[in-house]
Amino acid sequence: LTRILVHIALCLLPILSFGQDIHFSQTSRSEFQINPAFSGAFSGNLRATINWKDQWQSINKSFRTYSSSFDYSFGKGNARRPTYFALGLHVFKDVAGDVEIGNTNVGLSFSTLIKINRNARFIGALQGSYGMTGLNVANMQWGSQYSGINFDPSLTNGEGTEFSPYTYADLAMGVAYWYSKNDKNVIHRAPSDAKVGLSVFHLNKPHYTFDPKEDSKLPMRFVVHGSALFGTNYSNVYWYPNMNVMIQGKQHEVYFGSLWKIMLQSGSKTTGFMSEVALTGGVNMRVTNVIDAIVPQVFVSAYNFSLGLSYDINVSRLNQASSFRGGFEFSLRYTNPDSYIHRNPTRNAVSI
C-alpha cells in the first residue's frame, strides 16, 4: 500500500505543484500558457505550433503533455486603422502515471492590438476554455483488493469516491506591450522585438476535484513576463533575455535565462522572397524555493518553420528519484508571413 501511495503522489506532484496548469519549458513556443495577449503578437498573419513533453522519464509511466495552438490576425493591413484583432485556439492534454490521470483542455482567445505608433502596440485579450479531467479506474489497485495471496480486482476497493471524469469552464485575461521594429534603410542595423505583460488565469476559480462534495477550487494564477531581442556588435547575432514570474496560491515560480540567435540567412525586408534561416540556443533556469531545473534549448528556423528541442535537467531534491532526468521537449512551429509588404513595419522583423 505504501508503494501505491508513493506512486500516486509522484503522479500527482507535477499536477498539484501548480494547480493542474501545464508546464512547457520552451516558453517562446507555448505562449498560450503565459499570456492570451500573445495571440496575434508576431510578424505574420497566421502561425501554428505543436508541443510535446515527456517529463521525469526515469519514473515509471512519466508525465506526458501534448498541445497544439493556432492564432490568426486580421485587419492588420489597413494603414488607416489603428486597431486590428487576432483569434487564438489551443488544445492540450496531459497524462500521468499508471492510472493515466489526465486533463484535456480546449480554449479560445480573442485579442485586440492597438497601435500606439508605427512600432509599438498595446494588447488586451480574453480567453475562455473548457476542460475535462479523468483517470483510468481499471488501473487502480488498493490494499483492500489483496486477498493475502495475490491481487483480486473483483474485490471492492472500499473507497467512497467514484473517480468519475469531471468538466469545468475556465477564464483568463491578459494585457501586453509589444514593440517590434524592422529598419529597411540601414542594412546592418539590428531590428528589435520586446514584449512585457501581465496575465491572470482561472479568474472564475473553477471547481476542481473528483469529489463533488469537496469545495476544492483552482486558485488564480498570476503571470508577469518580459523578454527582448537585442542586436549585438555582430550584424547577424542577437541576444534574447527573458523572464516569467508565476504565482498561484502559495506556490511561486521564476523562470529566466537567455538565448543567442545566429542569423545564417536574413529574410528579405522588402520583397519577402527570401526566408530567414537561423540557429538559436541558450539556457534557462526554473526556480521555486530552490533551483528546480536547468533547461538547455536549441531552435533551428528555416523557410517559415522552426524546430525546437530542449531538456529539463532536474537539480532539485527529486533528482534522487529522477536521476537528474527531467524532461525532453519538442516543438514545431509554422508562421505564414504577411501578404502585404510596405504597410507593415514588423514584416520580417527579427524575432525569436
Regions found by a protein language model. Name each.
Residues 1-22, 337-352:
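Cleavable N-terminal export/targeting peptides
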Residues 28, 110, 116-231, 241, ...:
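Outer-membrane pore/translocation modules
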Residues 38-44, 75-84, 98-100, 116-122, ...:
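Short loop/turn motifs that connect adjacent beta-strands in outer-membrane beta-barrel proteins
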Residues 55-56, 93-97, 156-162, 209-214, ...:
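Extracellular loop and loop/strand-boundary signature of outer-membrane beta-barrel proteins
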Residues 61, 101-104, 136-143, 186-188, ...:
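Outer-membrane beta-barrel translocator domains and adjoining extracellular loop/strand segments
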